[in-house]
């Protein structure tokens, strides 16, 4: 045989081997198991650490399921997958046609949140399914150190999505910390000792469960205008929480579709609390130049001054003066500023020429304070009007907008969010959404989003000490949360007997713009609190859970760029001495605490080694604030 013929046959052989190998990898994927007669495939986190996702296909009716395991125990029991469109039922009758796996590594810098520099490492598996009629469904599964997520990918021509079959079945001996769903996401969290005993009804996609395999926070990520927001639906005495779309309305699909990530943040309580998985799954920033995006504390005037302040230039200048004295970078003007003088909720048709806002912005800028302003979202629904409002505000020098009362997670409203975010980014305006959805990865994709409400904050009267201690493990894991702490003058606080607890919330709750809701007079009456608030940094480099029990206790430490650790704690229950471990690093630390005394706030200091436990006195339903810095002989304060 000539060398030429040998080469020809060798080429054919290599081609055939490659084809056979590809078939083996996709149609008969490695890692398949046979539990009974079902086939199952594992997806593990790099580099093989927990958790593990198991995708299974029932051969009897072809319905897919997902199981999540960690440390040899179930976190999520076998739970249904799939969805139904106008053209096909993609929740059963499926067969696997292929599978591929890749490693995803992404590095990014966050302008807000628990940490600044982030690295996301995930294993991604793509499962290709089809029905006997030929309809196709791809399932993407990602597994990371801190969780599991999946999404559906549909080709063109599949039709509108009618519903999802997605659900999460918890082990029956799990506990739940959940809040009933409402469009503004503001209802309080409640703790149930069994997942099945939670009342029937809808629950938010920020549900925390304590399972035999660890904690699991169910959420979603990468929600945009191609889909609608989802919530969980629970039937009485059931361990299953089903995914329901907004008002059960069909999802309009044009072309192909990627659904949001159905996300399970899982691990021990520390892992879940410190997780950035919801952001990690979201698309990278759409804002190339982020140099203008500057977070930081703000003096918010609504709870301090109400309607009168919103319509008074004199009052707003007073707040600007106080923010400047405290070196807080922002002051927020709430509702009323564009209304007719002396009238409420009536827009001045000549607001652009009559408004005192340009004068306030100039006044504030001269003192080093940026002004942010409130807007009702309906002013920004029409593209022409949106451009008029935002361009005018930007030309005046306004630094940000607080947009309110969307109160919907419909597909149409999610499209509006994208339009508003594109416009605010173009005009270099920071954003705070109120009456809104929750972040769901939005802050990575649109880094000008400093914070969002989606929580029953300081202005509500139905908060409890248990609610305060649940939020760090639920809502605030998802993203920045505008609780607006620091309202010492409010008589309706659940921690009204604990000014130290109120102070601690300013650190315990992360928000890119930490809107401080107190009056200048209330801060002046509490010099220990005022001095602490003056030290708050613009952003956090790192976050660590020191101790906690969802709904009962939470103590978090957040590191500033200068190496100091700010610590906030809140507790539900009787007065006691809290044992707080210092997970701050080796060496000796000077810890300054602010606690409640019989005559007001008390400031104390102690020196402790990293890893040691300090004792902090806490009043009933109270808390504390602290500041820790490296100790050296002669150092007596952590203040700069």
Language model features: what each stretch is:
Residues 1-33:
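Secretory targeting and sorting signals
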Residues 36-280, 600:
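N-terminal accessory beta-strand-rich subdomains and adjacent acidic, glycine-rich linkers
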Residues 69, 575-599:
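Beta-strand-rich binding/interaction modules
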Residues 254-330:
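An acidic-aromatic substrate-binding cleft motif
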Residues 335-498:
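Aromatic- and carboxylate-enriched substrate-binding clefts and catalytic-loop regions
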Residues 500, 504-546:
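Catalytic cores of secreted or luminal carbohydrate-active enzymes
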Residues 549-586, 624-627:
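Carbohydrate-binding surface patches
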Residues 606-640:
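C-terminal beta-strand-rich structural cap/linker in extracellular carbohydrate-active enzymes
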């Amino acid at each position: 045989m000539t060398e030429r013929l040998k080469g020809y046959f060798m080429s054919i052989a290599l081609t055939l081997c490659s084809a056979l190998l590809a078939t083996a990898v996709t149609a008969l994927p490695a890692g398949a198991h046979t539990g009974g007669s079902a086939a199952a495939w594992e997806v593990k986190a790099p580099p093989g650490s927990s958790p593990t996702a198991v995708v299974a296909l029932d051969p009897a009716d072809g319905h897919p399921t997902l199981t999540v395991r960690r440390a040899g125990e179930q976190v999520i029991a076998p739970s249904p997958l799939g969805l139904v469109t106008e053209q096909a039922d993609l929740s059963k009758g499926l067969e696997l046609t292929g599978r591929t796996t890749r490693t995803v590594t992404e590095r990014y810098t966050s302008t807000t949140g628990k940490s600044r520099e982030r690295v996301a490492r995930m294993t991604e598996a793509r499962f290709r399914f089809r029905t006997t009629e030929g309809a196709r469904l791809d399932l993407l599964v990602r597994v990371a150190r801190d969780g599991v997520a999946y999404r559906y990918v549909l080709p063109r021509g599949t039709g509108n999505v009618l519903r999802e079959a997605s659900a999460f079945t918890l082990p029956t001996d799990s506990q739940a910390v959940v809040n009933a769903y409402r469009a503004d996401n503001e209802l309080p969290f409640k703790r149930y000792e069994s997942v099945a005993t939670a009342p029937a009804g809808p629950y938010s996609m920020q549900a925390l469960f304590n399972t035999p395999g660890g904690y699991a926070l169910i959420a979603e990520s990468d929600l945009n205008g191609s889909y609608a927001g989802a919530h969980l639906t629970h039937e009485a005495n059931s361990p299953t929480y089903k995914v329901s779309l907004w008002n059960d309305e069909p999802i309009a699909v044009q072309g192909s579709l990627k659904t949001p990530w159905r996300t399970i943040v899982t691990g021990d309580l520390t892992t879940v609390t410190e997780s950035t998985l919801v952001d990690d799954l979201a698309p990278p920033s759409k804002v190339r130049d982020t140099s203008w995006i500057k977070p930081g504390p703000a003096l918010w005037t609504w709870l301090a001054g109400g309607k009168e302040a919103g319509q008074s230039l004199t009052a707003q200048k007073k707040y600007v003066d106080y923010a400047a004295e405290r070196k807080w970078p922002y002051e927020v003007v709430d509702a009323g500023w564009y209304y007719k003088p002396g009238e409420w909720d009536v827009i001045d048709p000549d607001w652009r020429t009559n408004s005192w806002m340009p004068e306030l912005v100039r006044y504030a800028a001269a003192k080093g304070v940026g002004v942010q302003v409130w807007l009702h979202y309906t002013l920004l629904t029409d593209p022409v009007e949106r451009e008029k409002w935002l361009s005018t505000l930007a030309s005046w020098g306004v630094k940000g907008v607080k947009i309110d009362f969307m109160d919907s997670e419909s597909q149409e409203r999610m499209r509006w969010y994208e339009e508003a975010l594109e416009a605010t980014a173009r005009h270099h305006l920071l954003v705070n959404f109120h009456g809104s959805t929750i972040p769901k990865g939005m802050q990575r994709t649109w880094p000008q989003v400093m914070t969002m409400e989606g929580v029953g904050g300081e202005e509500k009267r139905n908060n409890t000490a248990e609610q305060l201690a649940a939020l760090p493990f639920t809502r605030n894991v998802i993203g920045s949360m505008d609780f607006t702490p620091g309202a010492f003058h409010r008589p309706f606080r659940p921690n009204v007997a604990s000014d130290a607890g109120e102070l601690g919330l300013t650190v315990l709750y992360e928000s890119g713009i930490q809107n401080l809701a107190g009056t200048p007079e209330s801060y002046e009456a509490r010099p220990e609190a005022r001095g602490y608030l003056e030290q708050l940094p613009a952003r956090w480099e790192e976050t660590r859970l020191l101790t906690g029990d969802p709904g009962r206790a939470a103590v978090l430490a957040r590191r500033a760029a200068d190496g100091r650790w700010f610590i906030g704690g809140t507790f539900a229950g009787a007065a006691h001495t809290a044992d707080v471990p210092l997970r701050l690093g080796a060496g000796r630390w000077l810890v300054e605490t602010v606690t409640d005394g019989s005559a007001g706030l008390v400031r104390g200091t102690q020196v402790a080694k990293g890893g040691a436990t300090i004792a902090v006195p806490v009043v009933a339903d109270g808390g504390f604030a602290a500041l820790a810095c490296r100790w050296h002989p002669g150092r007596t304060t952590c203040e700069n």
